[in-house]
Amino acid sequence: MDITKDETKIRQLTEQWRKIWSPEDKPFTGEGFENIFAVGENEILVFDNFDNSVVVLHSLQEYLDTWIPVMQNFSYWSIQLEDNLDISIDGDLAVTTFSWVGGGKTKDGQEVKAKQYGTQTWKRLNDKWRLVHEHLTVG
């Protein structure tokens, strides 16, 4: 087990996650999440604080079915991780913590700014790191 190699891979996957969440002026499709999240029913558990409520999701399909319609309201969206990505690895499990800032513009022209704090749990499945738990809270 090579902690440096594992940490590098998780950093790369976290950046891929951020890029998918930053479609800028293109439609948000979620394409690429299948290479980041564990797939299959009840493979993931997501708690996202959104619109004054908590969204709980259990599969990548639920994730896409929830966020694609929300993101269709935006003509532009982009996020950046703040300089605080922390990665802890123990065997086949890893935890990342971070915060992101960003925002965009709705299709009716309203500017939106956002910040969230995140915790993600990664598990090595079939020799590949996969996201199995995500918790995002509005900051």
Stretches found by the model and what they are:
Residues V95, K115-G139:
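Short beta-strand edge/turn micro-motifs at domain boundaries
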Residues Q72-N73, G103-K113:
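Short, cysteine-centered beta-strand-loop-beta hairpins and adjacent loop/turn segments enriched
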Residues I3-T4, K107, R124-N126:
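Short S/T/G/P-rich N-terminal loop/turn motif that feeds into the first structured element of a domain
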Residues Y63, L81-I87, W100-G102, Y117-K123, ...:
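Hydrophobic/aromatic beta-strand elements that line small-molecule binding cavities or substrate pockets
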Residues I79, D92, T96-F98, K113-Q116:
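Residue-level preference for beta-strand/loop junctions
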Residues T4, R11, G30-D90:
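A solvent-exposed, acidic/Ser-Thr-rich amphipathic alpha-helical stretch
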Residues D6-G32:
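Short, aromatic-enriched amphipathic alpha-helices that serve as compact interaction elements
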